């Protein structure tokens, strides 16, 4: 039920030991009911809300599956993780999200094994942009915030791809803000070593992320207008 798969990247990690498990994909059930095909992908960060079915599905998805609908993997992932940790001498565990439900796996591992735990937040959790534009019950918001607070507080380190304002928000949620660090997204330089340098007449700016009405990109266009 993931929208994009780049299977060619598997060759980059062939030397890394990988363990696969079963996962109960809640979104596969949505796809089956919606299109008759449970393998049909759902666009990232997209929650349709055009029909009665979509509205009900959105309400269920955001209020019953906390923190997200990928939580169907947690039972199987934790079961596998216990075997790996018991069999090997593991010192550190890193959980990355979204999906932020993966951090709940890390929480269970921390509770049982007391390993050093690093939480990697590729995107905000309770501040995730599409949560602001959808209706959620108060108990759903409180539970989501509670889970986030517990994960952040129990972790030994927190990594984000941005700093400044988001770090201020995170700092208010933990007793030790010094454990919050930023590591910017990077790229493999060798992929561009053989790309010839060009100086075209037109300059292209490409954004490959997600834009929504909750993002403030007006300043970008204002600056672009000034310098153009």
Positions of PLM-derived features:
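A short helix->loop->beta-strand "cap" motif at the edges of active sites that frequently abuts
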Residues: 113-116, 156, 176-179
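A conserved catalytic-core segment of Leloir-type glycosyltransferases
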Residues: 2-75
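Membrane-proximal helix-turn-helix segments that form the acceptor-binding/catalytic region
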Residues: 79, 101-104, 108-112, 125-126, ...
